[in-house]
């Protein structure tokens, strides 16, 4: 919110509204701060490639997840872990509204914030004046379906990045679109056996190369850093930019201190929706991801795959996939980007239908767009917030 306030300082939004943000339970400066791993444990986690999908390899990966879950339980306790989650955060939002003495809120939610906004308007529909949800999460999707669609979205973004990179003969992925994924694997797969060179003594692990790549795919503004990091791998030289991208995603500062964002994210998602525990279901998901997101897939399909961390979570879920409740007429607008890697476009289409809200479509390759400089989107959002002028379905 601090960054948004600066970018909106000359906007009608700043003239008409106070900007209020909050850290949900366990996140950021909220207390107690949810922390499951020490900084050293986070570094060690990132050194694990976790790509051996043989039965023994899967068992070893799942043991790492079990250890994570146990550390969360030991350090935070079951009552607190059970109290985090979107359902609780929506109630906390209403407590903030009441504390501010406001009858209604005007809400802008990005990415996970769309899930939080959907939960709020479901519980407190009369307390919403205007709500804009950008980068939507479809509340009807189960975790496996959502994971496959998200990975497919990152493949689309990777293809866009590679096509842009491939316009230059110096592109580390080459210039042949049919070879982009193969060339990528030739650069990153050797990191499973040996980290790549960086000025940081940690080196670049395979996991960090993947994480750094994924982070760069959120916005074209990061593509140049991805290219720089991949060029470093190609030359056997310095891959610092890929490590910096991974550190940015993981919330690690230059002194080696981590934010608690990733631990909190995992704790929240694990209580928000039931996670299948059948190993066969996860093997099927692995097969689907290999088909739809080949740049993320190491080695060959084995018929085995590790279950997600949430399959071992020590507290029960507090919600389940279900359609969003229709929003009061004229109170909500959904924004979705055609090639959003993290929250695929179709999720926005589906959420808008469930809320019976208009949809603003932005044609682009990035994660979220409101107040990122697109006049078509921003003008419609400002008119909606300030004057409650509800846009029709709009294409920008």
Q: Model features per residue range: what roles?
A:
Residues 341-346:
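Conserved alpha/beta-hydrolase "acid-adjacent" motif
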Residues 328, 333-336:
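Short beta-strand/loop motif that positions the catalytic acidic residue
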Residues 35-49, 119-183, 228-254:
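A catalytic-pocket lid/entrance helix-loop region that shapes and gates access to the active site
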Residues 90-91, 109-121:
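Glycine-rich nucleophile elbow surrounding the catalytic serine of serine-hydrolase chemistry
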Residues 75, 79, 90-105:
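Conserved acidic catalytic loop of the alpha/beta-hydrolase fold
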Residues 363-396:
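Catalytic active-site module of serine/aspartate enzymes centered on a nucleophile-bearing elbow/loop
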Residues 181-329, 357, 373, 379:
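Alpha/beta-hydrolase fold active-site neighborhood
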Residues 1-57, 62, 338, 350:
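N-terminal cap/lid subdomain of alpha/beta-hydrolase-fold enzymes
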């Amino acid at each position: 919110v601090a960054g948004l306030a600066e970018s909106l300082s000359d906007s009608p939004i700043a003239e008409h509204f106070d900007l209020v943000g909050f850290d949900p339970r366990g996140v950021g400066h909220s207390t107690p701060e949810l922390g499951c791993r020490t900084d050293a444990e986070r570094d060690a986690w990132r050194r694990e490639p976790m790509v051996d999908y043989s039965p023994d390899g899967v068992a070893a990966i799942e043991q790492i997840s079990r250890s994570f879950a146990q550390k969360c339980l030991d350090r935070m306790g079951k009552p607190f872990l059970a109290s985090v989650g979107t359902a609780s955060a929506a109630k906390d939002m209403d407590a903030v509204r009441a504390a501010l003495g406001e009858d209604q809120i005007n809400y802008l939610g990005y990415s996970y914030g769309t899930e939080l906004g959907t939960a709020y308007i479901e519980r407190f529909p009369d307390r919403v004046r205007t709500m804009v949800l950008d980068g939507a999460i479809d509340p009807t999707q189960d975790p496996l379906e959502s994971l496959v669609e998200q990975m497919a979205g990152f493949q689309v973004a990777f293809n866009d990045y590679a096509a842009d990179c491939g316009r230059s003969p110096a592109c580390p992925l080459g210039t042949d679109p049919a070879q982009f994924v193969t060339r990528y694997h030739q650069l990153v797969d050797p990191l499973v056996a040996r980290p790549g060179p960086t000025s940081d003594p940690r080196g670049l692990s395979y996991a960090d190369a993947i994480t750094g790549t994924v982070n760069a795919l959120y916005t074209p503004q990061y593509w140049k850093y991805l290219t720089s990091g991949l060029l470093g791998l190609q030359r056997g030289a310095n891959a610092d930019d890929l490590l910096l991208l991974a550190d940015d995603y993981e919330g690690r500062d230059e002194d080696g201190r981590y934010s608690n964002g990733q631990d909190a994210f995992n704790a929240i998602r694990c209580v928000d929706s039931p996670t299948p525990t059948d190993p066969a279901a996860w093997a099927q998901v692995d097969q689907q991801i290999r088909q739809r997101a080949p740049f993320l897939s190491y080695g060959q399909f084995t018929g085995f795959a590790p279950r997600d961390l949430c399959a071992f979570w020590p507290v029960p879920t507090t919600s389940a996939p279900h359609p969003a409740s229709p929003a009061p007429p004229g109170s909500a607008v959904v924004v979705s980007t055609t090639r959003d890697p993290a929250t695929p476009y179709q999720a926005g289409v589906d959420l808008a239908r469930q809320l019976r809200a208009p949809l603003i479509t932005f044609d682009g390759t990035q994660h979220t767009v409101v107040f990122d400089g697109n006049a078509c989107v921003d003008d419609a959002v400002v008119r909606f917030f300030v004057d409650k002028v509800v846009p029709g379905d709009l294409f920008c």
